């Protein structure tokens, strides 16, 4: 299973020319990999649309995939541990949501497609 981070979805909906967007296009066209959309990613992606028509179109596509809840106490505590470990190693994570998404992928053994240096 694969989680696609908001960094890729945003580029996808903006028709950006990038290998991660091309890969997502192929995955959506062929349906060979189950794409999971954590609710946190759903929020990050949909909050950026200005036009209602674009929001509806994006929502339809994302809701056609597997939307899963990504919150809860257990995940939050796992994310705290990951965050603290990264800080102890000298890494600064810019987004708390990115830590939650990463913890969600780790806890569920999901791959992550991203364009965000927080995940590197």
Mark where each language-model region is:
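A general structural signal for well-ordered alpha-helical segments in protein cores
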Residues: 21, 42, 55-58, 76-80
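Helix-loop "lid/cap" segments that line or gate small-molecule binding pockets
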Residues: 44-48, 66
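Active-site neighborhoods of divalent-metal-dependent phosphate/nucleic-acid chemistry enzymes
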Residues: 67-115
């Amino acid at each position: 299973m694969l989680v696609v981070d908001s960094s890729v979805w945003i580029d996808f909906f903006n028709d950006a020319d990038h290998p991660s967007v091309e890969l997502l296009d192929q995955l959506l066209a062929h349906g060979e990999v189950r794409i999971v959309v954590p609710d946190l990613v759903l929020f990050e992606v949909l909050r950026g649309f200005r036009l209602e028509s674009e929001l509806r179109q994006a929502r339809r596509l994302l809701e056609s995939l597997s939307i899963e809840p990504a919150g809860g106490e257990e995940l939050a505590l796992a994310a705290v541990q990951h965050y603290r470990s990264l800080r102890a190693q000298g890494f600064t994570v810019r987004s708390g949501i990115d830590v939650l998404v990463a913890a969600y992928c780790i806890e569920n053994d999901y791959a992550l497609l991203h364009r965000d240096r927080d995940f590197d």
